[in-house]
């Protein structure tokens, strides 16, 4: 059991009475509770694609994820999402990504650790920001742990660039990395399938590279209990 929504009453009582080394109960820091009680860690590798690097200037287009068992997940905006939030009011916050932001958060909540590349600086803060803007609940501090292959490269290796592409090329010998052009991003904003499909493939390739890079490098660094 790694999702509080699936917890039985007896388990919730145990979690409420538990105190971790941070001074929190198992309800506020469930990841600490799971670790202390020998619950097997479940890792979700993920990546997002968005209109802009800042969540107040762009929406999420799509996301892709894979767990350690090879289960694959994804979601992406559709023309229905775009039409649902169509407005001529200049003061309305764009919320076309509300559905896929929620589906990503729902998936993340089923795992006790997530991993991305520079996810500590981009994917997670962006998703959290979009969730708050879209009025969607985001997991509280201490709920889910995080790992980041960018941090591993930065602290344990000495490369000219700590990008996912460079890390994979130099340490693994290949990278699937491509680039999303401005025309593709604008196509995504219009809900055009050709653009969305290219963004989906780009995101999938990033996650495949991420998983390979994590497997090649994670043994060189202690797995910390840093919260999302």
Language-model region placement:
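N-terminal accessory regions of nucleic-acid-interacting proteins
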Residues: 1-42
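Two-metal-ion RNase H-like nuclease active-site motif
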Residues: 41-52, 203
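Conserved beta-strand scaffold positions in the cores of enzyme catalytic domains, especially
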Residues: 43-45, 72, 144-146
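Generic beta-sheet signal
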Residues: 43-44, 112-114
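RNase H-like nuclease fold core
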Residues: 50, 54-85
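Metal-dependent phosphoesterase core characteristic of DEDDh/y 3'-5' exonuclease domains
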Residues: 58-68, 113-227
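Nucleic-acid-processing active sites and adjacent nucleic-acid-binding tracks
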Residues: 71-105
């Amino acid at each position: 059991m790694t999702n509080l929504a699936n917890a039985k009453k007896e388990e919730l009582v145990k979690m409420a009475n538990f105190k971790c080394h941070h001074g929190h109960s198992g309800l506020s820091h469930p990841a600490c509770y799971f670790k202390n009680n020998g619950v097997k860690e479940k890792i979700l590798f993920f990546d997002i694609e968005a209109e802009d690097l800042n969540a107040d200037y762009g929406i999420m287009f799509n996301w892709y994820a894979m767990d350690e068992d090879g289960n694959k997940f994804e979601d992406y905006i559709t023309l229905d999402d775009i039409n649902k939030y169509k407005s001529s009011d200049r003061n309305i916050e764009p919320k076309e990504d509300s559905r896929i932001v929620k589906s990503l958060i729902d998936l993340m909540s089923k795992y006790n650790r997530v991993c991305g590349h520079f996810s500590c600086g981009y994917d997670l803060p962006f998703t959290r920001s979009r969730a708050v803007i879209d009025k969607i609940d985001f997991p509280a501090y201490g709920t889910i742990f995080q790992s980041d292959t960018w941090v591993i490269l930065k602290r344990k290796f000495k490369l000219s660039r700590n990008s996912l592409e460079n890390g994979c090329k130099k340490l693994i010998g290949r990278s699937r990395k491509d680039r999303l052009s401005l025309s593709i991003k604008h196509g995504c904003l219009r809900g055009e399938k050709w653009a969305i499909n290219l963004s989906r493939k780009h995101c999938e390739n990033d996650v495949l590279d991420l998983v390979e890079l994590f497997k090649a490098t994670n043994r060189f660094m202690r797995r910390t209990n840093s919260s999302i």
